Amino acid sequence: MNPIISAASVIAAGLSVGLAAIGPGIGQGSAAGQALEGIARQPEAEGKIRGTLLLSLAFMEALTIYGLVVALSLLFANPFTAS
């Protein structure tokens, strides 16, 4: 394998996980903060807010998992090498 392709694949894998985690991390923090604020204002709506929060957190985390899948495919099933 060409060492330049190998090095670029490792760098791209790290960047894909890192960049894929930035947006969902910010979104999850914001969503959790807003949910806590909503629960503080209306404690009787805690169950509904918590359920909606957990569902939305799962959807946000899926974006990070897609970045991990891209990184793993670059590391172990690299499409840029001729095998």
Swiss-Prot record:
It is found in: Plastid, Chloroplast thylakoid membrane. Its main location: plastid. The record marks 61 as: Reversibly protonated during proton transport. The lineage of its organism: Eukaryota, Haptista, Haptophyta, Pavlovales, Pavlovaceae. It comes from the Eukaryota. The keyword Oxidoreductase does not apply. In plastids the F-type ATPase is also known as CF(1)CF(0). Coiled coil: none annotated. F(1)F(0) ATP synthase produces ATP from ADP in the presence of a proton or sodium gradient. F-type ATPases consist of two structural domains, F(1) containing the extramembraneous catalytic core and F(0) containing the membrane proton channel, linked together by a central stalk and a peripheral stalk. During catalysis, ATP synthesis in the catalytic domain of F(1) is coupled via a rotary mechanism of the central stalk subunits to proton translocation. Key component of the F(0) channel; it plays a direct role in translocation across the membrane. A homomeric c-ring of between 10-14 subunits forms the central stalk rotor element with the F(1) delta and epsilon subunits. Keywords: ATP synthesis, CF(0), Chloroplast, Hydrogen ion transport, Ion transport, Lipid-binding, Membrane, Plastid, Thylakoid, Transmembrane, Transmembrane helix, Transport. Pfam families: ATP-synt_C (PF00137). GO terms for molecular function: lipid binding; proton-transporting ATP synthase activity, rotational mechanism. It is a multi-pass membrane protein. This is ATP synthase subunit c, chloroplastic.
